[in-house]
C-alpha cells in the first residue's frame, strides 16, 4: 500500500507561521503526500505554492470546537473554497449532538455540503468526547447526510483515534461513507492497524517520520 498518497500532511498549530506552512508544503512535495491540512488563513498561500502539483489542500471549518453559528461555518467553508481549498474538514456541533438535536446536525452538515458543491466534506465527530454508544449514533447520523467522510478527531482533545473508535465506526457507517483517522497517529503501526480497520485517509503531523520508517522497513528486506 502506498500510504503517502492517503496522508493529509497536517499543521494546525495556532502558532504556525507562513514559513512553517511553506516547509510543510515542501515536505508534501518531497514525500508525495496526497494532501496538506492547514488552517483557512493559509489556503491562498498554499494554492500559490502548490501550483502545478497534484497535492490537495484540506482546510478546517468550525475548528476545533464545532460550536460556531452554522451561518459562520457556511461562510467560512465558502471562502475557503474560493481561496483554493479542495476539501473541508468540519467539526460537528458536539453540544447539539449530546442533547440529541440530531436534525440540527444533519441540517448543518448538508448546508455546508451544499455550499461547497462537489468538493469533499469530512465531518469530525471528536471521538474522545463521546461514549462508544454515542460514536455509533454519530456515525449513523453522519451516514444519513451528504458528507463524504467521517473523521475521528481534531487532534486538539485529550486523545485522538483509537482502535475501538475505528471498529465502532466501521460497524455503523453506510457503505458510501469513508473514514479518516486523525489525532495521535505517530507511527507506522498505528496507520497500518487503522487501515486494516477501514480508514482510507489519515491526518497526522508526523507524516515524514512515519514514511521514513516505512522506507527503512522496506530496505530491511
Curated annotation (Swiss-Prot):
EC number: 4.1.2.4
SMART domains attached to this UniProt entry: DeoC (SM01133)
Catalytic activity field: 2-deoxy-D-ribose 5-phosphate = D-glyceraldehyde 3-phosphate + acetaldehyde
Pathway: Carbohydrate degradation; 2-deoxy-D-ribose 1-phosphate degradation; D-glyceraldehyde 3-phosphate and acetaldehyde from 2-deoxy-alpha-D-ribose 1-phosphate: step 2/2
GO MF annotation terms: deoxyribose-phosphate aldolase activity
Main subcellular location of this protein, as a coarse class: cytoplasm
A GO-annotated cellular component: cytoplasm
Annotated family: Belongs to the DeoC/FbaB aldolase family. DeoC type 1 subfamily.
Protein name: Deoxyribose-phosphate aldolase
Gene: deoC
